[in-house]
Design a protein with these regions (language model features):
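Short, flexible, surface-exposed loop segments at domain boundaries
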Residues: 2-7, 17-204
Length: 204
């Protein structure tokens, strides 16, 4: 069945929170898929995306899987490497929409500040936490090559960890955010998947 696909994300934005060390077809557009797994059939993953469409995503031996688990603001320390989708404030600071904490092995992933489409006007900042003020507005200073951003983290903003995972995480009902390539024939092939563990919804 022919489907319109309305969940395309900027490839550079997705690169901000997913490992990109996967061989890619040079001419395949990069897309993002957000939704819930409805079924697994071997290397085929059936997903109902957030816009309501049903899509089939193919996995390869190179598809990387990360677990997304709950975290707390107290888990973030100076020197932690994080990513945050956020909205701009009039004073030049950012207000976080979500925070994801990378494992040490992924430090440096997507370093920088760029546009993102989690919400209209949002940005993605990936970098190393410098100053961390929890008692006064929960404000993080995130430093990256060429700049830094001050990010205010409201109490209700989801904070998660990205952890090593495997295909055992991929089962019906699991919420996923993935980075994929869409071939000329419409085939979608996952390159990196962030899968919610224990009912967690990846907030990216």
């Amino acid at each position: 069945m022919k489907m319109t696909f309305n969940t395309m994300l900027l490839a550079s934005s997705l690169a901000a929170f997913m490992t990109l060390g996967v061989a890619q077809a040079q001419d395949a557009p990069r897309i993002g898929v957000r939704g819930a797994i409805t079924a697994m059939d071997g290397d085929a993953m059936h997903v109902k995306v957030n816009s309501g469409e049903d899509v089939t995503v193919h996995l390869t031996k190179d598809t990387q899987v990360r677990a997304v688990t709950l975290a707390k603001i107290e888990d973030i320390k100076p020197g932690s490497y994080i990513g945050s989708a956020a909205m701009p404030n009039a004073d030049g600071t950012l207000t976080a929409l979500e925070i994801h904490v990378f494992p040490p092995a992924m430090a440096g992933t997507g370093d920088g500040h760029r546009a993102f489409d989690l919400k209209e006007g949002s940005s993605m900042t990936n970098g190393t936490v410098g100053d961390l003020v929890v008692s006064n507005g929960r404000t993080l200073t995130v430093k990256y090559k060429g700049g830094e951003q001050k990010i205010v983290v409201p109490d209700d903003v989801p904070i998660v960890n990205l952890e090593p995972g495997d295909r055992s995480l991929l089962k019906a009902g699991v919420k996923v955010v993935m980075f994929a390539a869409k071939g000329a024939d419409g085939t979608i092939t996952a390159q990196a998947i962030s899968a919610g563990k224990d009912g967690v919804t990846p907030p990216m």
